[in-house]
Amino acid sequence: MNVSHLSFAGTRPRMAAPRLLIFHSHSGPGTETAAKVKSYIERSWAGGDHGVTVPHEHLDVEGPRTQLLPWDRVGISSYRANPFCIGVETADRKGANIEAEPWSEGQLQAMAEICVEFAQRTGYPIERATAW
């Protein structure tokens, strides 16, 4: 895992205890790499846009993990669940058959690693949500 924390990461509120892990997919230009996503977030934040998505981790198209925000800080990725949710954004696989293959093999491997790490840190079992 690469670590490249956002410049304002230390100013985010502390998270008491994560109890939810959620994966989202970025879409649009500039979401292929963590470096591009980080640059966009930094520019937005500096410009006063504090509503921009601030994930804990980003998975590039081929799967390398980059931590943008420590897991003990509150991110902005899950609306009312932000205070207790670890948010992970995955790069959009432009041109791929998203319905049939939403993630690359590298992304799937990184997602599995994150799930195991989350379960080890929190003690929660790895379960797929069946209802909201």
Question: What is each stretch, according to the model?
Answer:
Residues 1-129:
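Active-site-adjacent loop/helix surface patches within enzyme catalytic domains
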